[in-house]
Structures are given as C-alpha cells and as structure tokens.
C-alpha cells in the first residue's frame, strides 16, 4: 500500500478505534463534499458568466486541478503537480502566445476554476468510489457553464476515469479518446485496486464511455494487457512501430458520430531525457515534437482533456518537467478553445 494510501487508511483506523458514530461521520463527509462542490460550482459559474459577457467564444479551456496521487503504484508526488503546472504556464521564460498563435492572456482561451480539495475530502474518510463521484460531479459543474470545457491537471492517471465518465454522461454519449502514454493503463485492476492509475481505461471502455481509444507511445505492456487491448478493440501504437505509424497518427480524424474527442496526455509518454519528473521512468519514449505534431494535426472537436503524472518530487532543480507539462497544457488549451 502506498504512503498516501496508508495515511488515509490509518486515519480511518483511528476513527474506527475511537468509536466515532457512523452517522456522525457520514454527516461530516456530506458537509465537506457539499462545500467542495459549492466551491467548484461558484468558481465555474463566475468564469462562465465572464466568458459569456466577453462574447465571441464557442469553447474556453477551463483548468480544473485534481491533486490525487494515492492510486500511483510507485512514487506519489503527482498530487503536488497542479499548482506547479499553473505556475509554469505563466513563467516569464516564455511568452503568452501558443504555437498556433493564440494569446493565453485572453481569458477566452484559457481560464482557471481551481482544485478539487482531494486531501481534505479523504481526510474525512471518504472512500475511493465516492471520491471518484466527487471528481465526476466537479467536471460536470464546469461543463454546466457554457462555454467552459474541462482541461484537467493531475494528479495520477486514475483521474481520467471519473473525468471521462463525467464528460460522456454530460454530453449524452461516448467520445473518442487520444491517449499518449508509456503504458496502456488497461489492467482490470492492479494489485487489487480497481481505481489504480494502471486501470482507468479499462473502467472507461467497460463503461461504454469511449468508442475509440487510440494510444500512442506505448512501450511497457504485459501479455495480459495485450489481451485487454484485444478485448476492448484498442488502437495501440507502440514506440517500436512509431516510424511506420507516423503518417497515420499525424492525420488522425476522431469524434465523428460520437460526442467529440477527449485527449489524455501522460507526461511519461515522453522520453525521460525530456521529462524526468514523472513517477515511472520508461526509456525510449516520444519526443515533445511527436506529441505536438499529432495534436496540432488532429481533426475533431476536443470536448475535454487532461495532463497527468507530472511528479514535482522527481523533477530537476530548475523544474524542466514542469515547463514541459505546462507547454502541453498551453498547446492543448489552444487546440480546445475556439
């Protein structure tokens, strides 16, 4: 069991040993969750009203942080990522214009809702199933406010399941997913954890929340997971076939006949020489330009996305991976907004 998971588990043990009334605990959990959702609701409402008053925008990328790291099977520092990524987005080392010419100083391109208070919710003894529901509800609150679209900052990759579920349920149907990662994240469960960061896309596919799942950068895959790939009809593009697959990947057309496209970027999809600040180093990965070429050429309406698995605790002293993650967010935000 991970350090952060143990902390939550031991806290619940202390509550149980203190004979805390289940009714009292449930009431406390409900109040804290209501307060958390009220915060997200009011922040999203304000940002939505602001975008509508400015006018001339059909979609605004809305940053929602989900600082959750306890479902990681190794290092857990991704829980500390959202504020570091936000800081790097506005770092003075670069200007505010994206490669496609959008000015991030224009709030109609990118805005910020804030973070779901994951640690505070878990501190009340809320279990993983209910926590996932809180994440889903938070995403829906953002989507309630047209023209906001969720661009979620992880956190480990487990967050993609409740986020994609929310997007699909809110839009009333499945989406297509473009997924950059070193790992397929398709385990049915990992070491008994149904909500592991190694399992989100199994949850998504079995729930019918995605029609197509296109994975890019895969280079660590077990035979059991290959069976999962076959089971769910996943389109997996491994690093060993990247040269052959590049023409296909740089001309992707997704989202037709479904509710749009969701883009999930695990920072460990990149080679660790480019992005060392991740929990799981897997040599032989994508170059930064590989991701941008695929993303910038993607045809389809992007209705949501996430950038996950940046781990500040494993980054270099000057935060190079934070800058890498921030640029991924910047360029994805530019692609989403219109």
Curated annotation (Swiss-Prot):
Substrate binds at residues 191-193, 309. Its EC number is 3.5.3.1, 3.5.3.11. Pathway: Nitrogen metabolism; urea cycle; L-ornithine and urea from L-arginine: step 1/1; Amine and polyamine biosynthesis; putrescine biosynthesis via agmatine pathway; putrescine from agmatine: step 1/1. It holds the Pfam family Arginase. It is found in: Mitochondrion. InterPro entries: Ureohydrolase, Ureohydrolase_dom_sf, Ureohydrolase_Mn_BS. Mn(2+) 1 binds at residues 157, 181, 185, 266. It comes from the Eukaryota. Binds 2 manganese ions per subunit. Keywords: Arginine metabolism, Hydrolase, Manganese, Metal-binding, Mitochondrion, Putrescine biosynthesis, Transit peptide. One of its GO terms (biological process) is arginine catabolic process to ornithine. PANTHER family: ARGINASE/AGMATINASE (PTHR11358), GUANIDINO ACID HYDROLASE, MITOCHONDRIAL (PTHR11358:SF26). Belongs to the arginase family. This is Arginase, mitochondrial. The lineage of its organism: Eukaryota, Viridiplantae, Streptophyta, Embryophyta, Tracheophyta. The gene is ARGAH.
């Amino acid at each position: 069991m991970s350090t952060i998971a143990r902390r939550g588990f031991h806290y619940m043990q202390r509550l149980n040993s203190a004979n805390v009334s289940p009714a009292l605990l449930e009431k406390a959990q409900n109040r804290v969750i209501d307060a958390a959702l009220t915060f997200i609701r009011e922040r999203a409402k304000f940002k939505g009203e602001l975008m509508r008053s400015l006018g001339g925008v059909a979609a605004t990328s809305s940053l929602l942080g989900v600082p959750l790291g306890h479902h990681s099977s190794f290092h857990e520092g991704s829980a500390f990522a959202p504020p570091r990524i936000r800081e790097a987005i506005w770092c003075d080392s670069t200007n505010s214009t994206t490669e496609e010419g959008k000015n991030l100083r224009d709030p109609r391109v990118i805005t910020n809702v804030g973070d779901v208070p994951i640690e505070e919710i878990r501190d009340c003894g809320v279990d993983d199933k209910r926590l996932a529901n809180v994440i889903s509800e938070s995403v829906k609150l953002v989507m309630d406010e047209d023209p906001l679209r969720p661009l979620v900052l992880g956190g480990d990759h487990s967050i993609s399941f409740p986020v994609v579920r929310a997007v699909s349920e809110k839009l009333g149907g499945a989406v297509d997913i473009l997924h950059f990662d070193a790992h397929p994240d398709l385990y049915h469960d990992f070491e008994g954890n149904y909500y592991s960061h190694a399992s989100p896309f199994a949850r998504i596919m079995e729930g019918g929340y995605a029609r197509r799942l296109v994975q890019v950068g895969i280079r660590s895959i077990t035979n059991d997971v290959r069976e999962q790939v076959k089971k769910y009809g996943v389109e997996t593009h491994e690093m060993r076939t990247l040269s052959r697959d590049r023409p296909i990947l740089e001309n992707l057309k997704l989202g037709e006949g479904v509710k749009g496209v969701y883009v999930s970027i695990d920072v460990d999809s990149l080679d660790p020489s480019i992005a060392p600040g991740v929990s799981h180093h897997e040599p032989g990965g994508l170059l930064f330009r590989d991701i941008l070429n695929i993303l910038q050429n993607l045809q389809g309406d992007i209705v949501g996305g996430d950038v996950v698995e940046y781990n500040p605790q494993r980054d270099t002293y000057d935060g190079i991976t934070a800058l890498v993650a921030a640029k991924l967010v910047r360029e994805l935000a530019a692609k989403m907004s219109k």
